[in-house]
Amino acid sequence: SLCDAQRKIEGVWKGKTRTYDLRGKKFCVCMAGNPYTESGEKFQIPDMLANRADTYNLGDVLSGREEAFGLSYIENALTSNAVLAPLAGRDPQDLMAMVRRARGESVATSELSSDYSAAETSAITAVLRHLFVVRDVLLRVNAEYVRSASQADAYRTEPPFKLQGSYRNMNKIAEKVVAAMNAQELETLIDDHYRGEAQTLTTGAEQNLLKLAELRERLSEAEAARWAQIKAEFRRQKSMGGAEDDPVTRLTGTLSGLGAELAAIRDAVLAAR
């Protein structure tokens, strides 16, 4: 009813339910609207809302706040990790001090508002360092996800990337991170997480995992060859008009592709003279 003529919304104030009438008033709605749903379908803000609002994408207003955005991944994951969970209920400055310590800075115990044993401090530092690695991967995934979602299908040279680098992903990985992990175990944890995420996509699990490996610079020689094959086939099908278009469109696309190939051969011959 918030989007229609009623302009009403149900809420809770001081433990009691009430209805808020927002007719004639300006208000702000914050919502998580990903370009794609978890199944890989395009997400659309309902017209009843989009036609009556100024819509701002986080990516459009993030400039200059990248560090704060990156830190928000750590802050939102605190309660998901057994070692870091106590920090969620303590002075926020304790987290900032622990983050600085995990980055290699010298932090005096007097800067902490709560008492931490040496073992607890060491475990928190180790887990935070692991989460920095996870966070950096998720930020790359998120950037590619947004870039791919904003690209028109007509200009794609490779399949769309639909794996997400969200707070939800961060929390799911963070709950399995322990201080004793080594670098390889951490990379394997990320691999396993995204292997499971890829299975929720309606199509394209393989191609998305290969793109992820490329982003992480972890493509094997065989995977690199397979990824190149998939991209070449994607471009070939697109040049032919796609898999679902009518025969005339496909024929036109094929002839257009032949023309482009002949032009490339002509240019190569002229360049060799």
Per-region residue spans from a language model:
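C-terminal regulatory/interaction module of P-loop NTP-utilizing enzymes
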Residues: S1-R273
